[in-house]
Regions:
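Short linear sequence motif anchored by a di-proline
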Residues: 1-133
Length: 133
């Protein structure tokens, strides 16, 4: 998955899709939807393994337990499945802190002489898809 994504659905659409409700304090504090430009460090809806009927807002990016600086979370937004359970950055989260992260699109970039052009990619028959977090 790329570094930029989108989630243009309303809170109600997400609640219906996942049969869950937003954690009320998260919505009072911040109302992020819809968003055509989800980027690392942005607040984004997440459904955790521990609370599958509550949608929380968490900052996008992974901060390993051993990190001395939270800025490492800006860079840890992608993981390859091969070896994820062995890499120190992802191992503990992979085994103990699983979640799903909803999106409705992501961007791939084409380089041109004038600069980069974003292309938004969506699934043809699915309004909302999730990635593993």
């Amino acid at each position: 998955m790329c570094g930029r994504s989108s989630l243009t659905k309303t809170e109600k659409e997400l609640e219906q899709r996942f049969r869950a409700t937003f954690y009320s304090e998260d919505l009072e504090r911040y109302n992020p939807l819809p968003n055509y430009n989800v980027a690392p460090t942005h607040m984004h809806p997440v459904i955790t393994q521990d609370e599958p009927r509550i949608i929380h807002l968490y900052r996008w990016g992974l901060i390993p337990y051993w990190a001395k600086d939270i800025k490492i979370g800006y860079k840890l937004i992608n993981a390859r499945i091969e070896g994820i359970d062995e890499k120190p950055s992802f191992r503990q989260a992979f085994h103990k802190r699983r979640c799903i992260v909803p999106f409705d699109g992501y961007y791939e970039w084409q380089k041109t002489p004038e600069g980069k052009i974003p292309f938004r990619i969506q699934l043809k028959h699915v309004d909302i898809f999730t990635i593993a977090g």
